[in-house]
């Protein structure tokens, strides 16, 4: 990693809080279709950022660059990608990362970040899994995921009531399978929590994303989305101190004063200037 060259400093009178986004209705589609980790990488690697989403996906369909075994599966992959990502705006850095060696090496956590931000059901499911793990649980089963999913109706997600029993079961299973695909869980029936570790490169990527979507640096560090990667705030700060000691970043905190110097000031810049 290149030495720190750009700075971001925030001084706050009180600790900032992560933004509470407006509630977005859950969709069963994404978790049923799956994470599509390798397929998404292949699509992103051939993506023309100057072209439209339609033109790019038409090219994927005509060339079958992902090696789909059937036209039906190819169509489903393209539809899922179209619903899940916006490559010319919020997910531009993911496309850029797919075309770098570092981005490919750490593809799973990068994709997890973008997918969970795009699909609130997946993001909330990861937070629920964190609650189970932090409460001392060492495994989780589909029945528990189904119980959690059904409980979300009391939190305002009444759309779940409209799903069939089979759809709810498929979503619950899909949530745990996605967790396993991304390395957070292991096993088939009884999914056990893994000793997950977010490497330095994707950690800095996620940090830049959190800084961009929160008003203060303190709020970025307290953002609950770090829990998708099993990184509570205290552990995150310890990781930042280690990066500071390695001179990969500059990190200073004294009460409400937080100062960060990072290798880049955005994820686009990180990928293009540091990873490339």
For the regions a language model picked out, list residue spans one by one:
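Accessory, usually C-terminal, subdomains that scaffold auxiliary metal cofactors
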Residues: 186-267
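Short helix-capping/hinge SLiMs at alpha-helix to coil transitions
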Residues: 133-137, 213
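Long, low-complexity, charge-rich intrinsically disordered regions
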Residues: 4, 261-276
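DNA-recognition alpha helix
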Residues: 140-158
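Contiguous, well-ordered alpha-helical segments that form the cores/surfaces of helical PPI scaffolds
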Residues: 127-128, 147, 177
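Short amphipathic alpha-helical interaction segments
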Residues: 69-76, 163-181, 229-242
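Eukaryotic partner-binding/assembly regions in large regulatory complexes
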Residues: 2-131, 139-140
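Inter-helical turn/loop segments and adjacent helix faces that build the functional surface
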Residues: 153-166, 189
């Amino acid at each position: 990693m290149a030495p720190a060259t750009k700075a971001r400093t925030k001084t706050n009178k009180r600790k900032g809080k992560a933004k509470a986004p407006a509630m977005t209705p859950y969709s069963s589609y994404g978790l049923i279709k799956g994470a599509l980790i390798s397929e998404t990488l292949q699509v992103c690697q051939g993506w023309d950022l100057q072209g439209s989403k339609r033109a790019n996906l038409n090219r994927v369909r005509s060339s079958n660059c992902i090696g789909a075994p059937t036209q039906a599966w190819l169509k489903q992959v393209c539809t899922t990608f179209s619903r899940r990502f916006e490559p010319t705006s919020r997910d531009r850095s993911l496309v850029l990362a797919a075309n770098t060696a570092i981005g490919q090496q750490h593809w799973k956590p990068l994709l997890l970040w973008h997918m969970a931000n795009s699909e609130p059901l997946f993001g909330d499911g990861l937070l629920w899994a964190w609650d189970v793990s932090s409460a001392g649980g060492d495994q989780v089963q589909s029945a528990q995921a189904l119980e959690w999913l059904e409980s979300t109706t009391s939190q305002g997600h009444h759309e779940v009531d409209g799903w069939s029993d089979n759809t709810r079961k498929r979503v619950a299973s899909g949530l745990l399978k996605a967790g396993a695909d991304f390395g957070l869980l292991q096993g088939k029936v009884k999914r056990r929590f893994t000793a997950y570790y977010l490497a330095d490169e994707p950690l800095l990527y996620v940090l830049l994303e959190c800084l961009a979507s929160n008003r203060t640096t303190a709020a970025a560090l307290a953002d609950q989305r770090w829990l998708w990667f099993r990184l509570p705030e205290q552990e995150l700060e310890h990781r930042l101190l280690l990066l500071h000691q390695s001179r990969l970043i500059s990190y200073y905190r004294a009460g409400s004063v937080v100062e960060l110097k990072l290798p880049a000031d955005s994820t686009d810049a990180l990928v293009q200037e540091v990873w490339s």
